[in-house]
Each structure stands twice: as structure tokens, then as C-alpha cells.
């Protein structure tokens, strides 16, 4: 008699570098379920503090466990030297998330190596990374752009969270920690919004093949997350998701949209239809739109909507945000045949804005690879 097979998708989340390892720690703290966590770093001391299921210190010979010194080449070589070990850790995965803070050493240089290995093994590979603030300096910004370009070539789908957009999320007096916490929630909920669709049963189920159909070889992706309570909650949550200030570039040309609606057992068919219709109205007429629901009674009366748009040209012009009826704006009018009906994701040029830290001191720079920790992870 043959033993029963496990037909559940195997999902692994890899945090590499100071930022990636801290991101994994935060996901574990928040109770992200159904995935295996792997932490990879050149800083052996920082790795000891990780709560990940599996820890791998790389670059033992070249860095002696002291970090990459904010040098991506050191990070790349450290990951290359540990290729066999990384491959063994990723073997058997159906989907691999690679998360890092771009601009430093280990994450910037090592993330493309990890992603390449995962993809070679046949796993659906998704990168989720942060772009540093403009005020962190030109060198770090240039390193981040090079790292993002390399990671884009190595992943099926790459989601970039631009930290400069945090400055648009509140008034001028927003605290440093509140701004970082907002980005933290985007990173966590972005991964969770995808994994929950696969691992959590819902009224409308989405399986791994559906997710793979949207994200395989999709290139750059946009991600939006929204939540709301009370009357019109689903529509409000969808509006927030598709107009998130943490999204960069325009949705024009998107060929695939993945949408998740999470709520309690009282989640109604009418409100699901409202939220899905808003996204459908905003998408390309020929786009492949897949949506599913996740029933989670711990949410109470809250509804969460996650929208991921993939397979589009980020060079297209920006559009004004879509607003539903709850936002007081006009509904989207039908476009001519062959034209986009989307007015999503208006890009905003990065600007230098004074950051009010409420008395906190923020240190930027230096050779310590701790700078690889995304700002929203710094305590």
C-alpha cells in the first residue's frame, strides 16, 4: 500500500541580509502560518537573534561572520560560495519568497543568487524588497537600483516597496515608528495575502496553479492592501488597496490581477461582488483576473483586500486613482475597445521631505551591514 501524498503547496520565505532576516522575524511574530522560514546572513551575531526555522550563515571565510560591510559584491560572493547549501534548503519548495532590504551588502548582492537557485529548482519565485529613502544617500540608492535590476532578472515576479512613499502616508508630524510600521504591514500582508489564498480554505477557493498562472514569469508587480470596517467595508477596502501610496508606477498594461478578500464568516456575497467589480472595472479588458476569499473569524467585522497586478509595462504614464462610490468620486467610465479602463496607481515623483522623528535619532551610513535593515525594521 502506497503512503498518502501531501498535496499541499510547499511555501518557503527566505530573508537574506539584515533587512530580510528582520522581516522574517516580524512575520513570525505576527503569526504568518503555512510557510517555512529561512534566514540567511553574513552577520553571524545577528543571525543568532533570528526566530526562523532554518538559519544559514554564509561567507564564513570571506567575512568571518562579521557582515558584508554594505558591499553587494561581498554579499553576492558569500551567497555564491554557499550555493549547494542554499539549494538543499530550497529543494522541494513549490513557491519561494525572497525578501531583503535593497541598498546594503548581503541582501542586495545575495538575493539574486537565492532567487536564481529557487527558480532553477522549479519553484515559483517572488521577490519582495524595499527601496531605501532618498536621504540615505546616492551610493546606497545606486546599489539598490542595481540590486533590484539583478533580482528582477532572477525572479518570476518582483514586488518593490519604495520607502520614499512612506512620506505620503501621513501628515508632516507622522512619527518615524508609525511610518515604518505601515511599511512593515505592507510587507507582511503582501506575503500573507498570497499565501493565505493557497493555504486557507475560503468560499471561493484559489489554488496554487491559479497563483502560478498570474505570477509565473510576470516581471514587476504592483501590490496594494486595504482594510475597512462598518458599512461599505469591502468597497472601502478595495479602494484603499488599489490606491495605496506604497505602490509605484502605473497599472497600465497589466495582464494579470490576483485579488484576495478576507473577512469573517459574515462576509456577504453582495459585498464580495462590490469589491471584485471595482477591481474588474479598473483592469484591462483582456486581463486574467483571479480572485478568492479567505474566511478568518479573528478579523471580526474587518474586511481585508489584497490586490496584486502583474505582467505590465512600468514605463507607461501615470493615472489618477480609482475611487468607488464611497469615496465620493465618479465611477470609472467605459473605455473604448482595446483601451485600458484603469486609472490606478498614480505615480508620485520622489521628493526630499523633512522627516519628523519625535526626538528619535536615526543613524544612516557607515560600513556596518546593519544598514541593510530596512528603515521600517529599525527599532
From Swiss-Prot:
Location comes to:
Cytoplasm
Task: List the Gene3D superfamilies hit by this protein, alphabetically.
Answer: Tubulin/FtsZ, C-terminal domain, Tubulin/FtsZ, GTPase domain
Keyword S-adenosyl-L-methionine, does the record have it?
A: no
The ranges of region (Interaction with sepF) come to 363-379
Main location per UniProt?
cytoplasm
Assigned GO CC terms: cell division site; cytoplasm; plasma membrane
What outcome is documented for mutating residue 269 to E in this protein?
Strong decrease in GTPase activity
Molecular function terms from GO: GTP binding; GTPase activity; magnesium ion binding
Which SUPFAM superfamilies does UniProt cross-reference here? Tubulin C-terminal domain-like, Tubulin nucleotide-binding domain-like
**One Gene Ontology term from the biological process aspect of the record:** cell division
Give start-end ranges for the coiled-coil region(s).
none
Q: Which residues bind GTP?
A: 18-22, 105-107, 136, 140, 184
Sorted alphabetically, the keyword list is: Cell cycle, Cell division, Cytoplasm, GTP-binding, Nucleotide-binding, Septation
Question: Is DNA damage one of the keywords UniProt gives this record?
Answer: no
Give the protein's function: Essential cell division protein that forms a contractile ring structure (Z ring) at the future cell division site. The regulation of the ring assembly controls the timing and the location of cell division. One of the functions of the FtsZ ring is to recruit other cell division proteins to the septum to produce a new cell wall between the dividing cells. Binds GTP and shows GTPase activity.
Similarity remark: Belongs to the FtsZ family.
The UniProt subunit note reads as follows: Homodimer. Polymerizes to form a dynamic ring structure in a strictly GTP-dependent manner. Interacts directly with several other division proteins. Interacts with sepF; the interaction is direct.
NCBIfam families registered for this protein in UniProt: ftsZ
- The name this protein carries in UniProt is Cell division protein FtsZ
Which species expresses this protein natively?
A: Mycobacterium tuberculosis (strain ATCC 25618 / H37Rv)
Q: What's the source species' lineage?
A: Bacteria, Bacillati, Actinomycetota, Actinomycetes, Mycobacteriales
